[in-house]
């Protein structure tokens, strides 16, 4: 799919959008930013989807959190620390027995408990984690990966995820939707999130890939999504208006689901087969002991998941489980026919959701299966041959549309719907109609029955109002119970103890009314938008003529399954932020540790290569380095967990330094090391020393040439030169050079003596290489320092020139002021003027009156008479070097 089909242009904002397909078993994400247009967020292993869940372990007092594919190896070892398939627990309570039983079967070792809000939490190592918090951690890890991806593509660093859209099952009720929104509120994304149904997501993705739609003729399709939790069917229509620039119309007409069909049920069936075969071979093991062993059950379920994938493409799958129970390794083979036999009597339920969608339509079209243009498959388990066979029987093989990427169609569509909702990016226009799956009603305290606000099939988002006649006598409170179908989802409680008296007083002779406005928002969350108190003063007025009295804002909400309060959101969010910070610190330490380990193992390989080339020769340097590497590797094995990032980086630098030294030895093994070769080194070293002395003499001569001029204006050029060197941190180079010359001179004497006595011919290879390397290092260092000193001398001389010219300018200015003074000045002033004139005359008696001639690095004079204007520009230069001396002038 070309991006040009989807995007017209990006609006000039810096908010990135993240679409998430939050599945029960796996997660996929797609990021959209000005520099990353609809790109899948890859896992750390560069895969396009990740495992849904988290593993939390307390290791030596440190909380470690693991995500994604790493959970696969941890769930079989630490099932009690692993929380997977969390989506099924959102918005549920411990009273949902079927949900709890199914979850514990799929997740052996999980310790479920109830929160004070009547929701579910998972206890891990004695700590209670609300499901919303666990989901938030999972989502935050994806958000962090998306932000890292953006950072790699956008170097400005100002673009990051601020908006999120999440694909969810259409049948999610309000408690489940609110729980997911609460989980998002715990992440770093603070903007409102948009929830997109799976079926609509597929419909959007499919619509934008269909250029051949008939004009003004609705085409009907069914999205059949066989995911982990259930088989779901979404009926929708596509219509292309005659004006091709007008938006394509996408209308949702029906939905149904079947919980007895889905990936988890298929996996459970295969797990039962594995369990039966194991018990048949190992008769001493009881089924009870096997079922009650969390690790064994986790291993069986993991093997069943892999077998399901294999059986979708092959007639049989090999199961191999190490140390299943009591160190017993188990290996068996499962045939596809064995798996299908389990569902033989209930195969018809596979397509039950499709029949349900056709039989319970929410629109007026009322189509039949024959009117369907095609069935779009989605979800990983739609690949199961039995599923496709049953669909083909129902609608015909030709109507199964297989040109859709079943794995990514949901994330594509959910991302586009989210972009349309937020408007951050301009996309191809779509006219989308969604309908509610439930009735939404309200019951006010004192009323005998509830009133329907939004009927099943109502288009949303939507608003509606109900006008209630207020009771003659108010009690302490008014309560409005909101219902989704027959389930109470929210109680809005209004304290009327004080306010009702004010209302009655304002409407003494009339009738009070309460106008309650309800909202079914874009996330299909039903709530009261506002309550307005009105007065019909004469009892006969029309509603639009009622007198406004008050708006009720102070509403307390309560329900059986409570959402997170603002205080709980802050508390749980702060905890996640703290863990995230510690994770980042631990990650940085681990990355440094990985670098150190790689360095040490690389050094060990290098040592082996060195020894092979060295043959029978022995080097103390090599022995020392070998001992160093061995010691550090042993230290890491026992103490790596206690090392700080600073300690690790220090050891990395030390390792690299020693490795570099040994590398120079290695590269010198084949070098020429005779008397003539060392004589060449001696000659080169002598030239470097001579060069230093020449530079020193030349620099001193430069200062002597300027000494007289500086003395005339009252400055000591040598003192100023040394002061500038010190303030520019240049003096340390001279000290280093002097020390290196002293060392190099000693080495020259030592080698000359060795050559003269021919003792050099008897030196060991290691000592010869040491001497050669010492020569080379000292010569290279001194040559570098010579170049640095020459350059620094030029800079200092330039600063001295600025200093001199500023001083001369000040003298000229003073002379001009004295000349302009009136003749009535006292004798002392005349004497000062005479001194100034004499001072200036002496300073300018030879050469140019406003500049000092500069000399190049070879000692030749360079004309410095570019004019007073250029000198004044240099004097006014606001560079940091020049400003150092302002206080001295």
Swiss-Prot record:
Main localization (coarse): endoplasmic reticulum
Parts of the chain that traverse the membrane: none
Coiled-coil parts of chain: none
Gene that this sequence comes from: LHS1
GO-annotated molecular function: adenyl-nucleotide exchange factor activity; ATP binding; ATP hydrolysis activity; ATP-dependent protein folding chaperone; unfolded protein binding
Residues spanned by motif Prevents secretion from ER: 886-889
InterPro entries per the UniProt record, alphabetical: ATPase_NBD, Heat_shock_70_CS, HSP70_peptide-bd_sf, Hsp_70_fam
Superkingdom in the source lineage: Eukaryota
One record GO biological process: post-translational protein targeting to membrane, translocation
Catalytic activity line of the entry: ATP + H2O = ADP + phosphate + H(+)
This protein's name: Heat shock protein 70 homolog LHS1
EC numbers on record: 3.6.1.-
Glycosylation sites: 111, 366, 462, 502, 515, 716, 752
Key words, A-Z: ATP-binding, Chaperone, Endoplasmic reticulum, Glycoprotein, Hydrolase, Nucleotide-binding, Signal
Function, in words: Chaperone required for protein translocation and folding in the endoplasmic reticulum.
Source organism (scientific name): Candida glabrata (strain ATCC 2001 / BCRC 20586 / JCM 3761 / NBRC 0622 / NRRL Y-65 / CBS 138)
Annotated signal peptide: 1-15
Pfam families for the chain: HSP70
Compositionally biased tracts (Acidic residues): 820-833, 868-889
């Amino acid at each position: 799919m070309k991006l040009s089909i989807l995007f017209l242009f990006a609006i000039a904002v810096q908010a990135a959008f993240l679409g998430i397909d939050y599945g029960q078993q796996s997660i996929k994400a797609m990021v959209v930013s000005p520099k990353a247009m609809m790109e899948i967020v890859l896992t750390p292993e560069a895969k396009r989807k990740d495992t849904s869940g988290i593993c939390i372990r307390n290791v030596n007092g440190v909380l470690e959190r693991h995500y994604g594919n790493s959970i696969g190896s941890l769930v079989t070892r630490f099932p009690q620390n692993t929380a997977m398939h969390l989506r099924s627990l959102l918005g549920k309570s411990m009273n949902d027995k079927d949900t709890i039983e199914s979850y514990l079967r799929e997740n052996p070792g999980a310790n479920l408990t109830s929160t004070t809000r009547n929701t579910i939490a998972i206890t891990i190592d004695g700590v209670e984690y609300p499901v919303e918090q666990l989901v938030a951690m999972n989502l935050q890890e994806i958000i962090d990966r998306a932000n890292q991806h953006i950072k790699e593509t956008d170097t400005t660093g100002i673009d990051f995820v601020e908006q999120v859209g999440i694909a969810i099952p259409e049948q999610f009720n309000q408690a489940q939707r609110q729980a997911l929104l609460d989980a998002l509120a715990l992440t770093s994304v603070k903007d409102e999130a948009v929830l997109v149904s799976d079926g609509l997501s597929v419909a959007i993705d499919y619509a934008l890939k269909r250029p051949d739609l008939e004009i003004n003729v609705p085409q009907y399709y069914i999205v059949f999504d066989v995911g982990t939790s259930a088989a779901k069917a979404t009926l929708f229509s596509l219509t292309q208006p005659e004006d091709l620039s007008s938006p394509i119309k996408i209308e949702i007409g029906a939905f149904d689901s079947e919980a007895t069909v889905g990936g988890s049920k298929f996996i459970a069936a295969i797990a039962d087969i594995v369990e039966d075969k194991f018990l048949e071979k190992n008769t001493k093991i009881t089924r009870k002991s096997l079922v009650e062993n969390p690790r064994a059950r986790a291993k069986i379920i993991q093997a069943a998941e892999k077998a399901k994938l294999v059986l979708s493409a092959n007639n049989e799958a090999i199961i191999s489980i190490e140390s299943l129970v009591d160190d017993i390794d188990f290996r068996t083979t499962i045939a596809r026919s064995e798996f299908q036999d389990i569902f033989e009597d209930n195969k018809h339920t596979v397509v039950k959701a499709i029949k349900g969608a056709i039989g319970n339509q929410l629109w007026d079209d009322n189509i039949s299966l024959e009117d369907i243009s095609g069935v779009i498959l989605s979800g990983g388990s739609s690949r199961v041959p039995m599923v496709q066979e049953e669909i083909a029987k129902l609608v015909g093989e030709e109507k199964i549309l297989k040109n859709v990427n079943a794995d990514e169609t949901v994330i594509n569509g959910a991302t586009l719907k989210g972009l349309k909702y937020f408007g951050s990016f301009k996309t191809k226009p779509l006219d989308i109609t969604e309908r509610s799956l439930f009735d939404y009603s309200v019951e006010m305290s004192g009323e005998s029955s509830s009133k329907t606000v939004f009927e099943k099939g109502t288009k949303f988002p939507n608003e509606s109002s109900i006008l209630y006649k207020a009771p003659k006598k108010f009690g302490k409170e008014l309560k409005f119970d909101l219902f989704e179908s027959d389930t109470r989802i929210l109680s809005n409680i209004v304290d009327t103890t004080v306010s009702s008296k004010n209302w009655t007083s304002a409407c003494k002779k009339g009738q009070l009314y309460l106008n309650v406005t309800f909202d079914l928002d874009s996330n299909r969350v039903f709530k009261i938008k506002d309550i307005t108190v009105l007065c019909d003063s004469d009892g006969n007025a029309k509603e639009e003529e009622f007198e406004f009295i008050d708006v009720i804002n102070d509403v307390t909400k309560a329900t059986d399954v409570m959402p997170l309060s603002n205080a709980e959101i802050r508390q749980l969010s702060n905890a996640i932020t703290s863990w995230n910070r510690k994770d980042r610190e631990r990650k940085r330490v681990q990355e440094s540790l990985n670098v150190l380990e790689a360095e040490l193992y690389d050094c060990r390989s290098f040592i082996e290569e060195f020894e092979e080339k060295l043959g029978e020769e022995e080097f103390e340097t090599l022995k020392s380095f070998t001992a160093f590497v061995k010691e550090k590797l042993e230290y890491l094995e026992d103490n790596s967990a206690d090392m700080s990032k600073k300690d690790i980086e220090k050891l990395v630098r030390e390792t690299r330094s020693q490795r570099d030294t040994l590398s120079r030895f290695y590269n010198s093994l084949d070098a020429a090391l005779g008397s003539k070769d060392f004589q060449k080194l001696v000659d080169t070293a002598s030239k470097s020393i001579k060069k230093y002395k020449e530079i020193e003499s030349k620099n001193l001569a430069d200062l002597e040439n300027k000494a007289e001029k500086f003395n005339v204006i009252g400055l000591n050029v040598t003192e100023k030169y040394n002061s500038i060197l010190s303030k520019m941190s240049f003096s340390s180079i001279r000290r280093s050079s002097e020390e290196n010359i002293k060392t190099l001179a000693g080495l020259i004497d030592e080698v000359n003596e060795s050559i003269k006595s021919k003792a050099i011919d008897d030196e060991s290879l290691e000592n010869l290489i040491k001497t050669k390397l010492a020569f080379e290092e000292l010569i290279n260092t001194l040559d570098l320092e010579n170049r640095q000193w020459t350059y620094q001398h030029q800079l200092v001389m330039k600063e001295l020139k600025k200093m001199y010219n500023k001083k001369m300018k000040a003298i000229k200015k003073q002379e001009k002021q004295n000349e302009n003074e009136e003749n009535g000045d006292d004798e002392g002033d005349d004497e000062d003027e005479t001194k100034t004139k004499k001072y200036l005359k002496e300073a300018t008696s030879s050469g140019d009156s406003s500049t000092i001639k500069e000399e190049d690095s070879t000692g030749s004079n360079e004309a410095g008479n570019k004019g007073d204007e250029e000198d004044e520009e240099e004097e006014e230069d606001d560079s940091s070097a020049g400003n150092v001396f302002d206080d001295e002038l």
